[in-house]
Amino acid sequence: MKNFFYIYLSILLLFFVNCSNQNSKPKKLTIQILDTNVTDNSFNRLVEILNERFYQLEIEDIKIQRTSSNTFQIESAELLNKDDDIIRIILKRGFVEFKLIPEKEYVINVMNKVDSVLRNWIASNYEENFEDESSLDVYQQMELTDKDFSREHPFFSIALLDPQFRVADAFVREQDRDSLERFLRLSEIQNIIPEEIQFTFSAISQVDNEGNKFEMMYVVNKHSELSGDIIIDATASIDPSSEAPVINFTLNSYAADQWSNITAENIHKRIAILIDGLVYIAPVVRTRIPSGRCQIEGAENIDDARAIATILKSGTLPHSLTVIKDE
């Protein structure tokens, strides 16, 4: 009986050891570099920045191995315990831009033209064969509460403006974003959008009281007032007044001088801070900011805020990346 007990105990221990070994199996990500011209120098710089980001977030035992001219693998057991959103943020290129937002009257005028052209496009193509059938399918499938309004104002039926017109930012339901982007890509629409501006979206989704997700759509200047590796320090913390996560960052001396002049010349105007083309915050400039210190709000939690602060501090990756395999 005693021998049977020891045999049973040995089998049980072996089972737990095997489970432990399986659990410690490293997570492996295969990454594609979205550029055709990847030099050894640019790849080495990419690895250096990624290692710095992992180090700052206390993710250890990272192995990065190049597998082809434009692919590489990242391997670590610690990645198993990290949220996918954190990994996504770490792999962001991290290109920072400061862009002015045009006056709301100008933006609404542009939107009115887009709405009018889109209405005519739908009317002329609704019962005919046309090249971009996917866009029409989207229109037919949209879930709109007021069909009459959607026919007269197809743009404003999915780009919802503030009824009081305090700003010209538009609320876009998560399920409508693809439709809106597809409409904005139509050549008829592109031809009437002024060259000096662009439509873009918020980096972080919001949720209303009913649990519906939506994003903000902004119109910003194409020209950047500041851009590139201009940040020397960034930290994440909880704001004591709002109890929400914030990212505080400091510009380098050159950018701080430029920022001081930019804010002095644009009192009462809005400036958007973008990372990789998406807006994180678009505050009104109340006064000149001579210190070179800025703050970003809106991160979903403190872990996301730390990850964003890390990519700001580590600098811009020389190439954009995408995950093509996760195992």
Regions found by a protein language model. Name each.
Residues 70-72, 289-292:
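Surface-exposed aromatic
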Residues 58, 283, 290-326:
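Extended, hydrophilic extramembrane loops/domains of integral membrane proteins
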Residues 15-18:
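C-terminal motif of bacterial Sec signal peptides marking the signal peptidase cleavage site
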